[in-house]
UniProtKB/Swiss-Prot annotation:
This is Protease HtpX homolog. One of its GO terms (molecular function) is zinc ion binding. Coiled coil: none annotated. GO terms for biological process: proteolysis. Keywords: Cell inner membrane, Cell membrane, Hydrolase, Membrane, Metal-binding, Metalloprotease, Protease, Transmembrane, Transmembrane helix, Zinc. Disulfide bonds: none annotated. The chain crosses the membrane at residues 4-24, 38-58, 159-179, 199-219. Belongs to the peptidase M48B family. Its cofactor is Zn(2+). The keyword Acyltransferase does not apply.
Amino acid sequence: MKRIALFLLTNLAVVVVLGIVASLLGVNRYLTANGLNLGALLGFAFIMGFGGAIISLLMSKPIAKWSSGVRVIDGTGSADEAWIVQTVRKFADQAGIGMPEVGIFEGDPNAFATGAFKNNALVAVSTGLLQGMTREEVEAVIGHEVAHIANGDMVTMTLIQGVMNTFVVFLSRVIGYAVDSFLRRNDENSSGPGIGYMVTTIVLDIVLGFLASMIVAWFSRQREFRADAGAARLMGRRQPMINALARLGGMHPAELPKGLQAMGIAGGIGKLFSTHPPIEERIAALQNAQG
């Protein structure tokens, strides 16, 4: 979740900042000078939308290191560190990707993979994960993160986010133009965008951005199922990944009901924004997988 949450927040911030800068540079005035130029607006929205997503992707690795306090390791330290690096290398070779950077950070059980390119990524695990799981479970979690890299999930999410951003920028400015035109309908001397346009577009950039995040989060949840399956393939069996998920969920595999029903850890709006499916659904998907 940390990996995608950082990406989404960075992306939203970049889009809002770019929108404000565009207003200050007079781009909005150009678009509305003689009525709204939809063709120019669509091009502007595309550049803004994908620009924000690509900048977020390129910044994802350094931001993740900084925000999580990741300490990069090379396997020359403790025996545990050497094992982590060897495990990442083994899975990277199996998956056909370049060796990622490997790091450790302080905190509760967690792990993430990030980076703009498959051959220049980062896999980081927390001290809580190393202390609270068996080696086999940690190995499964590492396999899950390597699978994210091999599947190209960060690039895929960037493309999806770029499309969402484009719609957000386009719609917010069309609605902003309509609101501004209505507010100044009796002002014959008005020219260019007014305060109604600027306020509406900034507010809608934020509101529609959060709504778009629901769609991005849905796609992210589907990628998690694929990464779980990828970890099982790298491990050669499903049980280690099932055990790791059960450990993360605070339950022992033997205590799981035979017919797991799909139920969310958090209901309502929280589940819509969640980048990960409920643990129970992920375990059930692995248990029901063929092969």
